[in-house]
A protein has these predicted regions:
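Extended substrate/RNA-proximal surfaces in nucleic-acid metabolism proteins
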Residues: 38-152
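Histidine/acidic-residue-rich catalytic or RNA/ligand-binding cores of hydrolases
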Residues: 134-144, 161-171, 189-204, 230
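Mid-to-C-terminal alpha-helical segments outside catalytic/metal-binding sites
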Residues: 199, 204-230
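Divalent metal-coordination and catalytic microenvironments
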Residues: 30, 65, 127, 187, ...
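Non-catalytic positions within long, well-ordered alpha-helices that form the structural scaffold/packing
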Residues: 16-19, 117, 174
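An N-terminally biased module of ancient metal coordination in phosphate/nucleic-acid-related enzymes
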Residues: 1-60
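Short helix-capping segments at alpha-helix termini
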Residues: 54-63, 179, 208-213
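Short acidic/histidine-rich active-site segments
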Residues: 29-31, 180-196
Length: 230
């Protein structure tokens, strides 16, 4: 479907790996970027996830997969969410996972996020620590926090897989854990370089900075709440 498992056999092996690492629920979040030709329409994602879940059940793999989408930051995101053209995490209708660019925040970026919030959705911003502008200054994230956004750190960033700047920025964001809602994502793409097994390592790395209880909350209770209908 996107840039994850290449076939069902690999998907099943990734699921086994996730279960072995202690995961019981995963959110499938294919990218949505209308300008990239990646619509990831909710119904299509639901159908693919349902098919995967059937395969997991047949293989007796105790993993629940729920639909989601990673939405490219753009002016039309609020309208797409309201119109049902873009999905939410867990198909719960509450939280939208929105991805900023890896270089600069676009002009009007904060306003596009404000419109999403005003439309009644919560936002979790995906991997902000990998954005070059955020690596230079947390000013944009401070503005996002004022809107009530949560921030999702990528496991690989906390383990230095995306370079020292991403690691340093992830640490700077973790330092705001008293004030900012944070979650940690596996960002699972494959069986090796970006595997689900990294999530436990990332949690342990975060625990060195924020404590074990809070780090566990970032990989369990808080993301679980995001996929639960209000």
């Amino acid at each position: 479907v996107d840039d994850g498992a290449r076939n069902i056999a690999e998907a099943l092996e990734m699921a086994r790996q996730a279960v072995a690492a202690g995961t019981d629920t995963m959110v499938a979040t294919p990218h949505r970027g209308w300008f990239l030709g990646r619509p990831a329409r909710p119904q299509a994602v639901r159908e693919h996830v349902a098919g995967l879940q059937e395969s997991l059940n047949r293989a007796r793999i105790p993993l629940k997969v729920v639909p989601g989408v990673e939405i490219k930051m753009a002016p039309r995101v609020a309208d797409d969410l309201v119109n049902g053209e873009a999905g939410t995490l867990g198909d719960a209708g509450c939280w939208a996972l929105i991805e900023p660019p890896f270089d600069r925040i676009p002009t009007g970026g904060i306003e596009s996020l404000r419109k999403v919030v005003e439309a009644g959705f919560h936002i979790v911003l995906a991997h902000p620590e990998r954005c070059a502008e955020v690596q230079q200054s947390l000013t944009f994230l401070e503005a996002c926090a004022e809107l009530g956004l949560a921030f999702q750190l990528t496991s690989g960033s906390l383990l230095g897989r995306f370079g020292p700047r991403a690691l340093e920025t992830a640490h700077a964001i973790l330092a705001r854990a008293d004030d900012w809602p944070l979650v940690i994502a596996s960002d699972t793409h494959d069986l090796h370089d970006r595997s689900c097994a990294l999530l436990r390592e990332a949690r342990d790395a975060a625990a060195l900075l924020v404590g074990a209880e809070r780090a566990q909350e970032m990989v369990d209770a808080r993301p679980r709440a995001m996929i639960t209908p209000l």
